[in-house]
Design a protein with these regions (language model features):
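Active-site-proximal beta-alpha loop/turn segments in soluble metabolic enzymes
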Residues: 403-407
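A ubiquitous, low-specificity "background" feature that marks scattered single residues
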Residues: 251, 427-428
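Often metal-dependent polyanion-binding catalytic scaffolds in large enzymes
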Residues: 1-395, 409-416
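Conserved small/polar residues in nucleotide/adenosyl-binding loops
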Residues: 421-427
């Protein structure tokens, strides 16, 4: 789509609606609005003119207060500026909601669907085989990063979601109530978010974006390429930083890594439980319904801590579903088999981990840990290890025989490095 067309749509669907909803915001009985909302346009004008005249921020504010609130004390000025920040924060949230509500129309996602265009073009040019071959070696990895300043509190995220829906349906009354809720909801957090808090915030995006989107993309490709052999996990995967990025967050420990991975596993099983309940409503046939109910019960038992794991691996679950699929095709005219196959694709994509934790650590910490291990466990590596080439060092590290006595290590960073390495070994193997 031409840039001009996008700009026009943005002006009509976001900027004009912003004027409407911001006007609603100004009518609400909110402290920040009453103290700051009406003066904000004047402060904006003073800032523009002051910068144009070469004034610094302190001079701009002094001139503004002398012109519009000359009797304000220093404390009152500080309080006023704080209210300005509160008000602007909520204006930004309003814009976020308006942009989300208008995104598909602004960008004409149905018309500019690049994936659909690609598939249709390969069909018209008889290049389906080439596309299949390309996809067999293609992979895209979405990385969900984390930083405390990136996140709205959970309550604000929920308001954005509901406000987006109200805007899309032109429900002015509900939007006004949500704006009032927004004005009374704090944006600050009493404590800095922990790595577990960051993980919980990002799981919101896994739930509300990634799960359905990746499932839809996999279904679309396999339907239009007429194949069920795509490697969904390799084609689209998700990396997850919270709980693993030790080089970026000193509060990440092996215990946090384990807790985040358990949280991710529980969340994806909750999704599978929801989906299998929907499937069970359709697969009401003899024997098949019993098998689907067994799967549902196993999911439920793991989530309620009645059993340690519902299945030994995703492959075990897929093997059971393959048998159900064969029975559907052989005995029940393949009825609703598409729903079962779509569910299998999600299992192939997300496994029981949902997103893979990106375990990262400063190389200096790893080197220091290795040095301490060699000092306390000299027989583990050859005496010439330091003189080996990099490839030879790697080969020797992977061929180590023997066990590590963790109680001999004294450095906290070494203890944590060994602990999280031990956690990841079953996955790597």
């Amino acid at each position: 789509m031409a840039k001009r067309a996008v700009k026009d749509h943005y002006e009509n669907l976001v900027e004009l609606k912003y004027q409407l909803y911001n006007s609603l915001f100004l009518t609400l009985p909110l402290d920040a609005v009453e103290q700051a909302g009406l003066l904000l346009p004047l402060l904006e004008e003073s800032s523009h003119s002051g910068l144009a005249d070469g004034l610094d921020p302190e001079e701009i504010l002094e001139k503004f207060f002398m012109s519009h609130r000359p009797s304000m004390t220093e404390e009152a000025r500080a309080q006023f500026l704080f209210k300005i920040i509160q008000y602007v924060e909520r204006q930004v949230v309003l814009i976020d909601a308006l942009e989300d509500a208008a995104y598909s129309e602004i960008h004409r996602t149905e018309e500019s669907n690049k994936l659909r265009q690609l598939v249709e073009r390969t069909e018209s040019d008889a290049l389906q085989r080439e596309l299949k071959s390309t996809l067999a070696s293609f992979g895209a990895r979405v990385i969900l990063t984390a930083h405390p300043t990136q996140f709205y509190p959970g309550a604000v995220l929920a308001i954005i979601t509901d406000l987006t829906e109200a805007v899309q349906s032109n429900n002015i009354a509900t939007a006004r109530e949500l704006l009032q809720q927004l004005g009374n909801t704090p944006f600050y957090q009493k404590e800095n978010p922990s790595p577990l808090d960051e993980a919980s915030q990002l799981i919101w995006y896994l739930d509300n974006v990634c799960y359905e989107a990746i499932g839809d993309i996999s279904d679309y490709l396999e339907k239009y390429l007429d194949t069920d052999n795509l490697d969904s996990e390799s084609l689209l995967s998700i990396g997850f930083w919270p709980g693993g990025d030790r080089d970026g967050n000193p509060f990440v420990t092996a215990a946090i890594t384990k807790e985040v991975s358990a949280k991710l596993r529980a969340r994806i099983i909750e999704w599978y439980l929801r989906d299998i309940k929907v499937i069970r409503r359709r697969l009401s046939f003899p024997e098949i319904s019993e098998k689907i109910e067994e799967i549902e019960q196993l999911f439920h038992k793991e989530l309620t801590n009645q059993i340690p794991a519902c299945f030994s691996s995703p492959k075990e679950l897929i093997s059971i579903l393959n048998k159900v699929q064969s029975s559907l095709e052989d005995n029940y005219q393949g009825l609703f088999v598409d729903k079962l196959v779509s569910f299998k694709r999600k299992i192939q994509s997300f496994g029981f981990h949902f997103a893979s934790l990106d375990i990262r650590q400063d190389s200096r910490v790893i080197a220091s840990t290795l040095d301490e291990i060699l000092e306390t466990h000299p027989p583990l590596l050859s005496s010439s290890f330091e003189n080996l080439k990099e490839a030879e060092k790697i080969a020797e590290l992977f061929s180590i025989q023997g066990s590590l006595q963790i109680e001999l290590l004294s450095s906290p960073s070494s203890l944590d490095t060994v602990s999280y390495t031990h956690l990841t070994l079953p996955t790597n193997r």
